[in-house]
């Protein structure tokens, strides 16, 4: 069996290479367990001063979870007693990483999505290359942005946070630096030079001092931010998404369907679980007041609900397995959504709009 996770120690830096290029490094259960095993070993190794997450393919850092494997072996496997076993283990890994005792560095390139973001977003230093396509597309799969990433999405301006969280649209390297999701934006040709400096610095420094020295070196390679899709369309994002309810977002889009930008997003949102869209809309505001660990715990609760009622099964089947893009959602429109159920799931008494209007 091919090693999808390859650990390597270079002087005092432990490197975890993701090595499943055929699936764009999509994470399966064995990969998640292997990463945890390596990290625990290195955390207790005095010779290791820092850990680097990297990929052996330029096409992706990590495209998220292996959805086909997840669907077959967990969601549709009646023998599996714990259908949430994959997520519970993955989320515990992400919480462990968030509290890791040694400096963590991540190399974002190509596709960076879902579980790959969860694996790396709490790194002490994130290096982004120009090829990055960063996104949390979970609403198209019958659930919501998970692995604690809404803790970060909630820090974005309201309109952009909904654009990313509800519509699942991506961010580019310049966006990631601009909104403090990544620390440096470099040309791919400079990456090895920066890592060589990391290796040299790890011989002298450790902990926070090592990261501060690495940040100084990184500034030498930091590229000027470029105009991105988000920049070019920011006025439209504000116009359609800077709203106090999902109903208002829909209304704004409906009134501007002659705009191709609005039409495309409107059609996408209408094809998704309206219940989960309402959950994500409210979750954006809720996560502003939660810690990362609390956000992860909430994510697991929402995912368990999505598994129990079949929303995730239908979403993955539609988008990944059968590719008919018809998820058979019970809630065909916002009017079908029981907001009491949304509030109960999130543990809130009032929606954002209800709280705002008090």
Residue map of PLM features:
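Conserved CoA-thioester-binding segment of acyl-CoA-metabolizing enzymes
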Residues: 1-54, 95-96, 356-358
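Short, flexible helix-coil linker/hinge segments at the edges of structured domains or between repeats
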Residues: 75, 79-83, 127-130, 135-159, ...
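C-terminal alpha-helix plus adjacent terminal tail
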Residues: 2-6, 189-199, 203-358
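Contiguous mid-protein beta-loop-alpha structural module that forms a pocket-lining wall or clamp
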Residues: 148, 155-209
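Glycine- (often His-adjacent) and acidic-residue-rich active-site loop
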Residues: 55-89, 345
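Glycine-rich phosphate-binding loop at the start of an alpha helix
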Residues: 84-87, 91, 114, 170, ...
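Hydrophobic/aromatic residues within transmembrane alpha-helices
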Residues: 53, 66, 119-120, 175-176, ...
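Glycine-rich beta-to-alpha active-site loop
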Residues: 97-141, 164, 168, 173, ...
